[in-house]
């Protein structure tokens, strides 16, 4: 009986290890998943935000941002072969600033979303944003922080949609 249990334990470990190796290879080969590579890990269990963020509309926005299924120009421009230099934030472009419209800019830098940032995100990240804090923020497993990020994404997307339509 012990041999069977040991066999299944060894078998499970090998299957999990093989899955992790394939996951890392596939994600590493993608030109699209740069943010995802930085924040995700090859886990067997679902990401914690899927349980922590209770409102479906908030959870969906966070999931879309994490896997680049969003409408930021960094992604939309890729679909139409737009040059990287042309994928600028429409809100900032209005003010003469030509800043790449990526996830980092959307979450931590776009001046048009500053008030929402203060409302939903941790102050240490808001007052002194940098890319390492951005990655740490998206990897944070604290339920309140995950919910705050998700709420920010939802509200900022609404605000941004309204503002972009008036450009």
Task: Place the predicted regions along the sequence by residue.
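Family-specific functional microsites
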Residues: 2-6, 10, 14-17, 22-167
């Amino acid at each position: 009986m012990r041999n069977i249990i040991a066999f299944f334990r060894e078998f499970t470990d090998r299957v999990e290890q093989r899955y992790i190796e394939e996951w890392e290879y596939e994600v590493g080969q993608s030109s699209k998943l740069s943010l995802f590579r930085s924040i995700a890990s090859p886990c067997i269990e679902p990401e914690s935000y899927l349980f922590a963020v209770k409102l479906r509309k908030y959870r969906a926005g966070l999931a879309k941002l994490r896997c680049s299924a969003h409408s930021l120009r960094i992604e939309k421009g890729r679909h139409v072969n737009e040059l990287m230099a042309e994928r600028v934030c429409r809100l900032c472009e209005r003010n003469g600033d030509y800043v790449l419209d990526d996830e980092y800019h959307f979450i931590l830098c776009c001046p048009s979303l500053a008030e929402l940032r203060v409302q939903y995100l941790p102050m240490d990240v808001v007052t002194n944003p940098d890319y390492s804090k951005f990655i740490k923020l998206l990897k944070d497993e604290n339920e309140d922080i995950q919910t705050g990020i998700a709420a920010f994404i939802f509200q900022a997307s609404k605000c941004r949609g309204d503002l972009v339509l008036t450009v």
